[in-house]
Amino acid sequence: MAELTHLDERGQARMVDVAEKPETHRVAVARGRVSLRPETLQLVREGRAAKGDVLAVARVAGIMAAKRTAELIPLCHPLPLTKVEVDVRTNEQDTCLEIEARVETVSRTGVEMEALTAVAVAALTVYDMLKAVDRGMTIDRIQLIEKAGGRSGTWRREDDEARHAR
């Protein structure tokens, strides 16, 4: 198992020193979903939610969240993001909204947390916008799908869970 880099020799939490690492192009993709009732999904699809365009607002919320990750996750480095894409789409078969975020930077550390935060906040935004009509919504399957760049290279999730999260 890999060493926990956010702990010092005494086991105390610390922000990792990345000063000596080279700047490289980094990419991370994360996914998640919000399961809801069929009639709630229909409201979203038809643009009839009382609070407005759920898909557009969730997209923007995810982008904003990626940019503010270091303010939310205590040991994350503030990063100069070069690209953030958040896609929110309806899935009629599974009665859910699927969320995917792709985040890029040229930096000394990865953007996995930014991608995961984008998905989580987009999902929470969906819940906030629709809770008046469907308090039973479920947010789940928030996971890293892929990361590239840096010393550890490329990693991709290859299990069934990732395929089902699409």
UniProtKB/Swiss-Prot annotation:
CDD domains: MoaC_PE
Residues involved in substrate binding: 75-77, 113-114
Keyword Lyase among UniProt keywords: yes
Catalytic activity annotation: (8S)-3',8-cyclo-7,8-dihydroguanosine 5'-triphosphate = cyclic pyranopterin phosphate + diphosphate
UniProt KW keywords: Lyase, Molybdenum cofactor biosynthesis
Enzyme class: lyase
The protein's Enzyme Commission number: 4.6.1.17
InterPro entries found in the cross-reference section: MoaC, MoaC_bact/euk, MoaC_sf, MoCo_biosynth_MoaA/MoaC, Mopterin_CF_biosynth-C_dom
Functional summary from the UniProt entry: Catalyzes the conversion of (8S)-3',8-cyclo-7,8-dihydroguanosine 5'-triphosphate to cyclic pyranopterin monophosphate (cPMP).
Subunit structure, interactors included: Homohexamer; trimer of dimers.
Name assigned to this protein: Cyclic pyranopterin monophosphate synthase
UniProt organism field: Thermomicrobium roseum (strain ATCC 27502 / DSM 5159 / P-2)
The organism's taxonomic lineage, starting at the top: Bacteria, Pseudomonadati, Thermomicrobiota, Thermomicrobia, Thermomicrobiales
Gene: moaC
